[in-house]
């Protein structure tokens, strides 16, 4: 199913599916809702999970804590039905567009795992201008 990585051009411009798994054998997966386009979760797949996802048209991920493939929603009933799979230009990240109906994706019960909002103004770095202090360069 997955092809050997032969050349950069073939990977970036060709039709070969040749995912680049990291040193732990994983590839990151961003999952979004096909209807609302909201980000549902970030997960990981190993080779087996990726193949099962393609074959079954339902999302399978690698659980880094349990060290096993899990069929998303098998226990909760909120199966992620695959509508589209994309892989990025150098094939080291995957994007799933899924249908979850009215279900949730987060293991704590929320529709999206990204349910927390961080007020960005509280976490911005001071601009370099603010860090200069009160001395201005002298003009000659």
Segments the model singles out, each with a brief description of its role:
Residues 17-47:
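Short beta-strand segments
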Residues 47-61:
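A short, polar/charged loop-to-alpha-helix boundary motif
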Residues 35-36, 47-50, 91, 101-103:
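Short, charged/polar surface micro-motifs in flexible loops or helix N-caps
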Residues 123-130:
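Conserved small/polar residues in nucleotide/adenosyl-binding loops
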Residues 38, 93-95, 133:
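General beta-strand recognition
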Residues 134-140:
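Hydrophobic alpha-helical segments, chiefly the membrane-spanning helices
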Residues 59-119:
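Short, structured beta-strand-loop surface elements
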Residues 2-24:
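Short, basic/aromatic recognition patches
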């Amino acid at each position: 199913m997955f092809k050997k990585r032969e050349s950069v051009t073939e990977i970036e411009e060709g039709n070969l599916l040749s995912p680049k798994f990291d040193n732990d054998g994983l590839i990151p997966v961003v999952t979004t809702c096909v209807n609302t386009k909201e980000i549902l979760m970030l997960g990981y797949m190993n080779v087996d999970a990726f193949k099962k996802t393609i074959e079954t048209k339902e999302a399978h991920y690698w659980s880094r804590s349990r060290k096993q493939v899990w069929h998303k929603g098998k226990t909760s009933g909120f199966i992620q039905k695959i509508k589209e799979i994309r892989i990025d230009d150098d094939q080291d990240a995957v994007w799933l567009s899924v249908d979850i109906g009215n279900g949730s994706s987060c293991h704590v019960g929320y529709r999206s795992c990204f349910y927390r909002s961080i007020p960005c103004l509280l976490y911005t770095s001071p601009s370099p201008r603010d860090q200069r202090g009160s001395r201005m360069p002298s003009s000659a």
